[in-house]
């Protein structure tokens, strides 16, 4: 009898473990590294996370000055596990920036590049890729941009009529030199949902990111939210914080 009881305990424990494993497999992440070719012939490495269901909303992740999608860490996977199709995209200047020996040098280097190419070619190609996926609803795509990525995102949001934008550590009066003011871009973006994020002590905009984001919030019409995280940080650092990740996932679910 005692031996029989142990067998039953072992058997049911096995069933529980098997069920948990089966659920993990069912809800697991289908991750694929893809090479996206832009209209001007550049080849961009990206990682695509397919959704578990059809007609899913999509999210494109645009990196910071480093132009490297890998700096998002586990964020793409967490977004995917929450039900989104996710494309994490490298930007064309990744290899150039990788040679910089400091953050200051990286910023100086990126400022000398053709930044509009990041909108006209890189982001456009990412949007086309994600929109073409049969499991993705092309009318429900959001862009999350961190630091430099937020500048690319706000212009792309207007240019390509993106459903929702998450702009992390955006700062300054203009997205790119000699381009439309951010105030005008926000007006052009219209009533569509926009989330502004920054840290309490964000070094963006020479320490004026907090002041700038409060202005953006005032300028924006329609659906908008301003999320100021505790402590210090900038761009991807903010998004990686557990509370920030949860907040963004919830916000996207409510606005896509």
Predicted regions and their residues:
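N-terminal cap/lid segment of alpha/beta-hydrolase-fold proteins
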Residues: 23-53
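Short beta-strand element of the alpha/beta-hydrolase
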Residues: 56-64
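The serine-hydrolase catalytic nucleophile loop
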Residues: 65-77, 91
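Conserved alpha/beta-hydrolase
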Residues: 79-103
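Alpha/beta-hydrolase active-site loop
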Residues: 108-134
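Primarily recognizes the serine-hydrolase "nucleophile elbow" in alpha/beta-hydrolase
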Residues: 125-189
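The feature captures the conserved acid-bearing segment of alpha/beta-hydrolase catalytic domains
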Residues: 164, 171-228
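C-terminal catalytic histidine-bearing segment of alpha/beta-hydrolase fold enzymes
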Residues: 221-256
């Amino acid at each position: 009898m005692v031996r029989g009881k142990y067998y039953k305990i072992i058997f049911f424990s096995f069933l529980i473990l098997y069920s948990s494993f089966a659920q993990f497999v069912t809800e697991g992440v289908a991750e694929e590294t893809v090479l996206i070719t832009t209209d001007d012939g550049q080849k961009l490495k990206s990682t695509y996370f397919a959704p578990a269901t059809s007609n899913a909303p999509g999210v494109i992740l645009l990196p910071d000055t480093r132009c490297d999608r890998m700096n998002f860490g586990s964020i793409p996977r967490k977004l995917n596990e929450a039900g989104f199709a996710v494309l994490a995209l490298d930007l064309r200047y990744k290899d150039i920036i990788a040679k910089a020996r400091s953050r200051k040098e990286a910023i100086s280097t990126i400022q000398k590049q053709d930044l509009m190419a990041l909108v006209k070619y890189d982001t456009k190609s990412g949007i086309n890729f994600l929109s073409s996926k049969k499991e993705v609803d092309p009318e429900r795509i959001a862009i999350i941009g961190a630091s430099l990525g937020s500048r690319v995102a706000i212009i792309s949001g207007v240019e390509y009529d993106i459903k929702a934008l998450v702009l992390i550590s955006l700062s300054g009066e203009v997205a790119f030199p000699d381009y439309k003011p951010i105030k005008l871009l926000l007006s052009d973006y219209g009533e569509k949902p926009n989330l502004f994020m920054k840290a309490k002590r964000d070094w963006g905009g020479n320490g004026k990111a907090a002041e700038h984001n409060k202005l953006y919030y005032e300028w924006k019409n329609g659906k908008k939210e301003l999320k100021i995280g505790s402590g210090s940080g900038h761009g991807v650092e903010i998004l990686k914080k557990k509370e920030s990740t949860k907040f963004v996932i919830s916000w996207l679910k409510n606005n896509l």
